[in-house]
UniProtKB/Swiss-Prot annotation:
Subunit structure: Heterohexamer of two alpha and four beta subunits.
Protein name as it appears in the record: Prefoldin subunit alpha
Keyword Kinase among UniProt keywords: no
Organism: Methanococcus vannielii (strain ATCC 35089 / DSM 1224 / JCM 13029 / OCM 148 / SB)
Family to which the UniProt record says this protein belongs: Belongs to the prefoldin alpha subunit family.
Length: 146
């Protein structure tokens, strides 16, 4: 196999790995988006009812009344907590959602570009394989007539 063909196969492999990593990143972003949306919904509900469902584990929950539903305590690092107004946290989370959506669009665009390149390289490799096969058949045909 010539060097150019080997390079195309290697490029194809690299591009496929890139697409896979980007798709994994998209999945992670989707999980973060879902988590933020749930948190925003919970805080919105908390503002009106003062009641929240606390997870106990294994799919079980308990309803609880919140003493101060206007304040949210955020973990901002290892053993570091920060108290903020619920409206401020909701706004921060919505801003984070916007940023995640923008990142998601960029990654999706990159996946599309990389996938097009994969398709282009595959097409070239298929043409070369067909040409090699045709050349091989032609050689066999000529050697059989001797």
């Amino acid at each position: 196999m010539n060097e150019e063909l080997q390079n195309q196969f290697m490029a194809l492999d690299v591009y496929n790995q890139q697409v896979q990593k980007l798709q994994e990143e998209l999945s992670n972003i989707d999980l973060m988006i879902m988590e933020l949306v749930r948190a925003i919904e919970s805080m919105e509900s908390l503002k009106t009812s003062g009641e929240i469902m606390l997870p106990l584990g294994a799919g079980s929950f308990v309803k609880a009344d919140v003493k101060n539903p206007e304040k949210i305590i955020l973990s901002v690092g290892v053993d570091v907590l920060l108290e903020k107004d619920v409206e401020e946290v909701i706004l921060d989370f919505k801003n984070s959602l916007d940023e995640l959506e923008k990142t998601k669009e960029l990654i999706t665009t990159q996946i599309q570009k990389t996938s097009k390149e994969v398709t282009r390289i595959r097409g070239e490799l298929e043409k070369r394989a067909a040409a090699i096969e045709k050349q091989s058949q032609t050689k066999r045909g000529h050697s059989g007539s001797n």
